[in-house]
Design a protein with these regions (language model features):
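Cysteine-centered metal-binding/redox modules
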Residues: 1-94
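ATP/Mg2+ or Mg2+-diphosphate-binding catalytic cores
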Residues: 94, 360-403
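An alpha-helical support segment within catalytic cores of ATP-dependent transferases
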Residues: 98-111, 225-272, 278, 282-284, ...
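ATP-binding glycine-rich phosphate-binding loop
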Residues: 112-136
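Active-site acidic catalytic loop and adjacent metal/ATP-binding pocket
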Residues: 127-137, 142, 175, 257-302, ...
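A conserved alpha-helical element in kinase catalytic cores
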Residues: 145-189, 204-216
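Conserved kinase catalytic-core helix
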Residues: 200-232
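Active-site activation/catalytic loop segments of kinase-like enzymes and analogous catalytic loops
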Residues: 303-340, 355-371
């Protein structure tokens, strides 16, 4: 029986994969072909395509089989037949496992001191993780299981981030220890940990929520006493090897040259993916961050810059028309900097952080998305001065109103 918990998007397990030659994967986007221990790096062509189509495995995609598949895996001539067999086996396993998964998860919950625990709604069913709402006499909880193939460092980093940001400071879901004092348990091929269930609502892309998100981000960046580094790479060096065969490479390298060395600038506790999609509002109105997978000590400017192109550029995938959400960007900055405002030097660094963060994702959605992502990058950069003028005009208006 196939162990799907160790399988990556291409239908193989990276560790010990027979397709690798001298440790290199033929399906890698990067020229050297080196694949890290965990394949979810965005450099694998198949994984990048799956990420673009929001599916865990290629054979679960609604477009399977597609004409691009043989091009992405030319070394596997029977790929469609093989993937069809995997899809059938996967579905059969899901049907058989779902019949007893509740009782198995309830046995997992026995590790925690809960009275009358029960398994409720499952979230993100096709994510590769097991995420369930848990009911108990003491309230609601969230049980999260990461595949055992996930590196231990990722699990430990996630746990430490929740303990710091959640348990100590209330800016994320708190983590609950087991009866024996452990932070997570190994069972069913997963590492499980139990978290606080946030009663409230998901943040939305509104000026009001962006303002609240900016305030919460400021609080997070000011926290002291954490020393676990974020796994997010701060260096821009690797990007100089990207897109060598694209017509825009000269302009791309010029953009890279202008980006500062963020590892030499402000370091603090960072989330790495700040946006309404990763934040909630408690019933009392307080903002909390969720999905702390890459959280830790990192660049404040990369963290702060993330949404200014990645989120605030609204891209229509059908028409390729773009618009900039100035209202959201202004509200987020106002929430973060408050009445003191933002200096021009600080603003430049934030926007350079936005540029680098967008570049870091330009290989994550496959080679066919690169040109669109390049257009988004240039469009986002072109809005920089217009947003600055908007901020300055609002500051003048506020100053006039306070006299």
């Amino acid at each position: 029986m196939t162990d799907f918990t160790t399988m990556t998007a291409c239908g193989e397990c990276c560790i010990g994969c027979a397709k690798k030659e001298s440790g290199m994967c033929p399906g890698c986007i990067e020229a050297e072909g080196k694949v890290p221990e965990w394949a979810e790096s965005g450099v694998c062509r198949i994984y990048a395509c799956c990420a673009e189509h929001n599916t865990r495995y290629c054979f679960l995609c609604e477009n399977f089989p597609c004409g691009e598949l043989p091009k992405m895996m030319p070394w596997k001539t029977d790929v469609e037949e093989h993937f069809s067999e995997l899809r059938e086996e996967y579905r059969n396993q899901r049907i058989s496992s779902e019949s007893d998964v509740t009782s198995r998860l309830e046995r997992v919950l026995a590790h925690w001191d809960l009275e009358a625990p029960g398994i409720g709604e499952q979230f993100n069913k096709d994510s590769g993780r097991l995420i369930y709402k848990v009911t108990a006499k003491s309230g609601w909880y969230l049980l999260k299981g990461l595949p055992s193939g996930t590196p231990e460092a990722v699990i430990q980093g996630n746990v430490q981030a929740h303990l710091f940001l959640g348990n100590e400071h209330g800016l994320a879901p708190a983590l609950y220890p087991t009866k024996s004092g452990d932070r997570y348990v190994n069972d069913m091929g997963y590492r499980f940990y139990l978290m606080e269930f946030i009663a409230g609502r998901q943040m939305e892309e509104t000026p009001e929520d962006e303002y609240k998100l900016g305030q919460a981000t400021r609080k997070m960046h000011l926290l002291q006493g954490y020393n676990v580094k974020s796994p997010l790479t701060q260096s821009k060096a690797r990007y100089y090897t990207w897109f060598r065969n694209h017509a825009f490479v000269k302009e791309f390298d010029g953009i890279l040259d202008a980006i500062p060395y963020f590892e030499e600038l402000d370091q603090c506790f960072v989330h790495t993916d700040i946006g309404p999609h990763n934040a909630m509002v408690r019933t009392n109105g307080e903002a909390v961050f969720i999905d702390l997978d890459d959280s830790g000590i990192g660049s404040r400017y990369l963290d702060l810059g993330w949404p200014f192109i990645m989120q605030f550029v609204d891209f229509n995938h059908e028409t390729e028309e773009m618009r900039y959400r100035f209202d959201l960007a202004e509200a987020f900055l106002r929430g973060y900097y408050g009445e003191e405002g933002i200096s021009r030097e600080e603003y430049d660094l934030v926007f350079q952080g936005a540029v680098q963060m967008h570049i870091s994702y330009m290989q994550s959605y496959g080679p066919y998305a690169v040109d669109s992502l390049w257009k988004i990058l240039r469009f986002g950069m072109e809005q920089k001065e217009a947003l600055w003028e908007m901020i300055r005009e609002k500051e003048k208006t506020d100053e006039g109103g306070s006299k």
